[in-house]
A protein has these predicted regions:
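Structural motif
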Residues: 14-15, 171
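Active-site-proximal loop/short-helix segments
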Residues: 18-38, 42, 67-84
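Second-shell residues forming the walls of enzyme active-site clefts
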Residues: 46-59, 63-192, 196-202, 206
């Protein structure tokens, strides 16, 4: 698929103000079978080019992209929804390939972390919970956008849901996401989190400001009903 075609297919056609707030272009390499419908290619050049086209197409439609899963999920050998997933490649390989794609998107206002263990960098903690990995995202990849976790209830993370939330925040994550709908778990997460830091507030405001700048100032409700068929 050409980048221009990717941009067209990423265009939600003026429904952003009602349906779409954010969307997550996946910038990982296509290696593992469970990723095959979710990635843009096998090489840095392909993923960066098609990812940028998708990113620009979303912006043009008033939808704020959330780049994911930082700093790269493609070389993982297992599905992180189901259990621990590791990447065994060297730091030198990763910084020139998987991580490099995210460096190409350092201008993004929002990103999502990967629940992946990178053995060459931090073999003990998945990137979401690893201060070392988050420091790489901030310093080496120059990403200063709002950084959120993937779903805390995924099986790749150790410990209880509340301890996962605390560890992510202490590692440097700005926002933790709990997505399975269990209200009791959500309450337990809310009870253990600290207040956002001033830097997190700054990143939030930058993301909100960028998002608000994309939203149409007026909305034709009749035209929207016709487009949705309701």
């Amino acid at each position: 698929m050409l980048p221009s075609h990717r941009k067209m297919t990423s265009h939600p056609h003026n429904l952003s103000a009602v349906i779409f707030g954010v969307e997550g272009p996946r910038l990982s390499f296509l290696e593992h079978p469970f990723l095959q419908n979710r990635c843009y290619g096998h090489t840095r050049d392909d993923v960066s080019a098609l990812g940028r086209a998708a990113y620009d197409g979303l912006l043009a439609s008033g939808v704020m992209p959330v780049i994911k899963h930082m700093p790269g999920h493609g070389m993982a050998v297992a599905d992180s929804h189901k259990g621990v997933s590791r990447v065994t490649e060297s730091y030198e390989y990763l910084i020139e390939n998987d991580f490099a794609v995210f460096a190409d998107f350092s201008d993004a206002k929002m990103g999502m972390s990967a629940h992946i263990l990178f053995d060459a960098i931090d073999p003990l903690w998945p990137a979401t919970l690893s201060p070392r990995m988050i420091d790489i995202m901030r310093r080496e990849l120059a990403f200063d956008g709002l950084l959120m976790t993937d779903d805390l209830s995924m099986e790749a993370l150790p410990g209880t849901i509340p301890t996962r939330a605390m560890a992510a925040q202490r590692a440097g994550i700005d926002i933790v996401l709990h997505c399975n709908g269990d209200a009791g778990e959500m309450q337990s997460v809310a009870e253990v989190l600290e207040q956002p830091t001033p830097k997190t507030h700054q990143r939030m405001q930058a993301a909100i400001g960028a998002r608000d700048a994309l939203v149409p100032q007026s909305l034709d409700i009749d035209a929207l009903h016709a487009q949705l068929g309701v």
